[in-house]
């Protein structure tokens, strides 16, 4: 069934170019998806290149297993654990580049059975890995009203969060919601002011999905691990699709592109300064999709690619 869903990889060439591929390098594609980035990376390798791909979606793993290439291997798990995967293979400090394409993919959105979309009726699931953790329906049925409101406000930036949370709890008390259409209808009815250009359930679905999959924590942990696993000169190439993701990536790159912040006038020896270490990253800028790509793939509109390089510090 999954092969019926077309996936157009956003900023494909730009993200891979950002890795500055070495033919004999070792790289990580932390979000294999349907393999667009991985296949392009493999095409730029020599015989000694090595690509470790990661994904927690079983459907992505099934696609990855069709790649018959000794330079390629796939891991079923969250990219937040990339530090562990690298350590298990004795590759700490040897990784030449890490690519992350954040958020939900088109095949996940377009498959009603995955429960990510308010546009298609399906089970209210939303898990990247349906074999682990609580589904969206299970969480919404057990969560406190205040907790639901907090999630909607924090992860969806939903201004009617309290009103929507109350409606969700009341509906679940009457009859537990199990379908995406049911949640979308409850949210729409609880939203007093409609946005002309956006479905009223957009922010709620985003927020619940992020919460169910711990998406922002996953990003923060992966970024933190990247500093340990990257070789000097190794690249980070990260595509984000909304402001919450991009804010985390931007802040991480900015903070690690500065040296230690020492108060002016604080007496320190050269040896003490050396122990503090220098900046760990060099930010190489950001890219956004051009008009042509957005016209071909409207979902690319909000994407931002940020690139950074590991220093020798």
From Swiss-Prot:
It catalyses: cytidine(1402) in 16S rRNA + S-adenosyl-L-methionine = N(4)-methylcytidine(1402) in 16S rRNA + S-adenosyl-L-homocysteine + H(+). Keywords: Cytoplasm, Methyltransferase, rRNA processing, S-adenosyl-L-methionine, Transferase. Signal peptide: none annotated. Its EC number is 2.1.1.199. It comes from the Bacteria. GO terms for biological process: rRNA base methylation. GO terms for molecular function: rRNA (cytosine-N4-)-methyltransferase activity. The keyword Transit peptide does not apply. It is found in: Cytoplasm. It holds the Pfam family Methyltransf_5. InterPro entries: RsmH, SAM-dep_MeTrfase_MraW_recog, SAM-dependent_MTases_sf. S-adenosyl-L-methionine binds at residues 35-37, 55, 79, 101, 108. GO terms for cellular component: cytoplasm. It is an enzyme of class 2 (transferase). The keyword Oxidoreductase does not apply. Specifically methylates the N4 position of cytidine in position 1402 (C1402) of 16S rRNA. Belongs to the methyltransferase superfamily. RsmH family. PANTHER family: 12S RRNA N4-METHYLCYTIDINE METHYLTRANSFERASE, S-ADENOSYL-METHYLTRANSFERASE MRAW. This is Ribosomal RNA small subunit methyltransferase H. The lineage of its organism: Bacteria, Pseudomonadati, Pseudomonadota, Gammaproteobacteria, Enterobacterales. The gene is rsmH.
């Amino acid at each position: 069934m999954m092969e019926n869903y077309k996936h157009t990889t956003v900023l494909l060439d730009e993200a891979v170019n950002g890795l500055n591929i070495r033919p004999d390098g070792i790289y990580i594609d932390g979000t294999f998806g349907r393999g667009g980035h991985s296949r392009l990376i493999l095409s730029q390798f020599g015989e000694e290149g090595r690509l470790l791909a990661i994904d927690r979606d079983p459907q992505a793993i099934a696609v990855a297993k069709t790649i018959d290439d000794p330079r390629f291997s796939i891991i079923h798990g969250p990219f937040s654990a990339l530090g562990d995967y690298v350590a298990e293979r004795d590759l700490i400090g040897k990784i030449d580049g890490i690519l992350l394409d954040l958020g939900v993919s088109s095949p996940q959105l377009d498959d009603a059975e995955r429960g990510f979309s308010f546009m298609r009726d399906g089970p209210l699931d939303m898990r990247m890995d349906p074999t682990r953790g609580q589904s969206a329906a299970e969480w919404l049925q057990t969560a406190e009203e205040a907790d639901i409101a907090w999630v909607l406000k924090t992860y969806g930036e939903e201004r009617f969060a309290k009103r929507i949370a109350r409606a969700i709890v009341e509906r679940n008390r009457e009859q537990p919601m199990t379908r995406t259409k049911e949640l979308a209808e409850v949210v729409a009815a609880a939203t007093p002011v409609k946005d002309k250009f956006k479905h009223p359930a957009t922010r709620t679905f985003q927020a619940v999905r992020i919460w169910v999959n711990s998406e922002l924590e996953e990003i923060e942990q992966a970024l933190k691990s990247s500093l340990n696993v990257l070789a000097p000169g190794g690249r980070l190439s990260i595509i984000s699709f909304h402001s919450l993701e991009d804010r985390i990536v931007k802040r991480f790159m900015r903070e690690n592109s500065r040296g230690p912040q020492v108060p002016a006038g604080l007496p320190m020896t050269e040896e003490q300064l050396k122990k503090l270490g220098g900046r760990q990253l060099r930010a190489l800028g950001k890219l956004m999709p051009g008009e042509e790509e957005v016209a071909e793939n409207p979902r690319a509109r909000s994407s931002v690619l940020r690139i950074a390089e590991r220093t020798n510090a």
